[in-house]
């Protein structure tokens, strides 16, 4: 069965209840939310999120809890060599895991971090150490952190599959570390999904293990392979292309994994209902952008 949805906003006054209702209106049976704005660490109290109401609506619409995905804010950097800033990140992510657990979300996607003025290996080590501390603080939880593949901008860690696996290898509680594949990021990092898809999928299995992939972000790319730009494009309008993305979405290796669209708004409007329909029908609509 296809589990497909998109990022959905969580806004007051309806909060998580509104997110679930929005996803259902898109024809989705999966979704991803931030517990607040992705650009900051300001968060509402958990009791204000309308969790009970949200979960009832999800249940009534056959939206499985296993297909609900959380995402940590972009500004968190577990590879930061500054001890004070890293300590803040550890505390905040521990609180985020508590919030998502209260929302019955069992996986939180995380951009691994930027090594800044150190080096990749030092960054990888700091991320693993930080994850150990986070899991120790939240040992009563089972919520996973899903490390995302990155495009390789600046000093990002995660542009190579091996870097993500190194982090998991170093972490003590490996059951709480999984992986999020982002199609745009993989392509921009140099994995040519269009020309070498099956070879790359086999690499994913041999390096990360299919069983450790918990989320897939489905995005086209505005830029060529190996550009390290990380600029998402609407499905079928970028350099990866509709047919290649369909092959990934429907690939037998990923059949049980929730796929999440993070494509850009068109004229400030969400395209997700239409993109989900294109994917379900396997029929690309070249006029999509003219609908808004």
UniProtKB/Swiss-Prot annotation:
<feature type="binding site">
    <location>
        <position position="148"/>
    </location>
    <ligand>
        <name>Zn(2+) 1</name>
    </ligand>
</feature>
<feature type="binding site">
    <location>
        <position position="148"/>
    </location>
    <ligand>
        <name>Zn(2+) 2</name>
    </ligand>
</feature>
<keyword id="KW-0862">Zinc</keyword>
<dbReference type="InterPro" id="IPR001719">
    <property type="entry name" value="AP_endonuc_2"/>
</dbReference>
<dbReference type="InterPro" id="IPR013022">
    <property type="entry name" value="Xyl_isomerase-like_TIM-brl"/>
</dbReference>
<keyword id="KW-0378">Hydrolase</keyword>
<feature type="binding site">
    <location>
        <position position="182"/>
    </location>
    <ligand>
        <name>Zn(2+) 2</name>
    </ligand>
</feature>
<dbReference type="GO" id="GO:0006284">
    <property type="term" value="P:base-excision repair"/>
</dbReference>
<dbReference type="Pfam" id="PF01261">
    <property type="entry name" value="AP_endonuc_2"/>
</dbReference>
<feature type="binding site">
    <location>
        <position position="217"/>
    </location>
    <ligand>
        <name>Zn(2+) 2</name>
    </ligand>
</feature>
<feature type="binding site">
    <location>
        <position position="262"/>
    </location>
    <ligand>
        <name>Zn(2+) 2</name>
    </ligand>
</feature>
<comment type="function">
    <text>Endonuclease IV plays a role in DNA repair. It cleaves phosphodiester bonds at apurinic or apyrimidinic (AP) sites, generating a 3'-hydroxyl group and a 5'-terminal sugar phosphate.</text>
</comment>
<dbReference type="GO" id="GO:0003906">
    <property type="term" value="F:DNA-(apurinic or apyrimidinic site) endonuclease activity"/>
</dbReference>
<keyword id="KW-0255">Endonuclease</keyword>
<comment type="similarity">
    <text>Belongs to the AP endonuclease 2 family.</text>
</comment>
<feature type="binding site">
    <location>
        <position position="111"/>
    </location>
    <ligand>
        <name>Zn(2+) 1</name>
    </ligand>
</feature>
<keyword id="KW-0540">Nuclease</keyword>
<feature type="binding site">
    <location>
        <position position="71"/>
    </location>
    <ligand>
        <name>Zn(2+) 1</name>
    </ligand>
</feature>
<protein>
    <recommendedName>
        <fullName>Probable endonuclease 4</fullName>
        <ecNumber>3.1.21.2</ecNumber>
    </recommendedName>
</protein>
<dbReference type="GO" id="GO:0008833">
    <property type="term" value="F:deoxyribonuclease IV (phage-T4-induced) activity"/>
</dbReference>
<feature type="binding site">
    <location>
        <position position="232"/>
    </location>
    <ligand>
        <name>Zn(2+) 3</name>
    </ligand>
</feature>
<dbReference type="GO" id="GO:0003677">
    <property type="term" value="F:DNA binding"/>
</dbReference>
<dbReference type="InterPro" id="IPR018246">
    <property type="entry name" value="AP_endonuc_F2_Zn_BS"/>
</dbReference>
<keyword id="KW-0479">Metal-binding</keyword>
<feature type="binding site">
    <location>
        <position position="230"/>
    </location>
    <ligand>
        <name>Zn(2+) 3</name>
    </ligand>
</feature>
<dbReference type="GO" id="GO:0008081">
    <property type="term" value="F:phosphoric diester hydrolase activity"/>
</dbReference>
<keyword id="KW-0234">DNA repair</keyword>
<dbReference type="GO" id="GO:0008270">
    <property type="term" value="F:zinc ion binding"/>
</dbReference>
<dbReference type="InterPro" id="IPR036237">
    <property type="entry name" value="Xyl_isomerase-like_sf"/>
</dbReference>
<feature type="binding site">
    <location>
        <position position="185"/>
    </location>
    <ligand>
        <name>Zn(2+) 3</name>
    </ligand>
</feature>
<keyword id="KW-0227">DNA damage</keyword>
């Amino acid at each position: 069965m296809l589990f497909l949805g998109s990022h959905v906003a969580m806004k007051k006054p309806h909060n998580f209840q509104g997110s679930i209702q929005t996803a259902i209106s898109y024809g989705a049976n999966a979704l991803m939310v931030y517990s607040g704005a992705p650009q900051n660490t300001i968060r509402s109290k958990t009791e204000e999120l309308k969790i009970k109401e949200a979960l009832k609506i999800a249940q009534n619409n056959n939206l499985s809890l296993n297909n609900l995905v959380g995402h940590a804010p972009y500004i968190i950097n577990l590879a930061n060599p500054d001890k004070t800033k890293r300590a803040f990140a550890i505390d905040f992510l521990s609180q985020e895991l508590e919030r998502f657990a209260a929302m019955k979300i069992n996986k939180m996607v995380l951009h691994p971090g930027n090594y800044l003025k150190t080096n990749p290996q030092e960054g990888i080590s700091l991320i693993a150490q930080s994850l150990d501390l986070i899991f120790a603080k939240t040992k009563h939880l089972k919520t996973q952190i899903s490390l995302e593949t990155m495009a390789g901008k600046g000093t990002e860690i995660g542009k190579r599959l091996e870097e993500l696996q190194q982090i998991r290898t170093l972490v003590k509680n490996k059951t709480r570390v999984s992986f999020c594949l982002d199609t745009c990021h993989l392509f921009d990092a140099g994995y040519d999904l269009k020309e070498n898809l099956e070879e790359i999928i086999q690499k994913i299995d041999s390096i990360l293990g299919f069983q450790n992939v918990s989320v897939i972000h489905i995005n086209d790319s505005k830029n060529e392979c190996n550009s390290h730009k990380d600029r998402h494009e609407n499905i079928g309008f970028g350099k990866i292309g509709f047919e290649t993305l369909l092959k990934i979405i429907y690939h037998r290796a990923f059949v049980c994994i929730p796929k999440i669209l993070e494509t850009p708004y068109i004229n400030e409007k969400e395209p997700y209902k239409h993109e989900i329909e294109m994917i379900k029908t396997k029929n690309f609509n070249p006029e999509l952008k003219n609908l808004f």
